[in-house]
Amino acid sequence: MPGDFKGWHSRGFLQHFDSPERIQHLVFRTKDSLPSAVLAALPSDSRAKRRIVASWLDRGEGTAILLSAAVANIVQQTLLHFDGARYRLMAWCIMPNHVHAVMEPLDGFPVGSTVRGWKAISAASINRLNETSGPVWARDYFDRYARS
């Protein structure tokens, strides 16, 4: 595995696969998109966990800050900023409480670092716009690499 790419790894909640030039579907969500009671009751089975999380995300729970055109524009501009330099962004969809992105990481720029960058940069801008502080995004993200 070249550079800083980790292959299969986990920070305790979700398994991730990080590899250069491997197309990834990524989903990251706002901090308040899932009620804490739902998070606490998530099963350990990863397939069931993904199904429950997806169901709750589709409900648009939380403050749904991404419904704001100004906030959604911040997220979109953040996604586009390093397109072609650190990754190849193929598609994205900004939902009321989560974001989907399909991208291919370029050598030297692991997926985890890219997602952390997207979250940090967009959160700072969103907090500045809304005159708020604190976390905007949930800690983890979901990824699935495209199989050929």
Q: Locations of the language-model features?
A:
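Short catalytic/metal-binding and nucleic-acid-binding patches
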Residues: 1-148
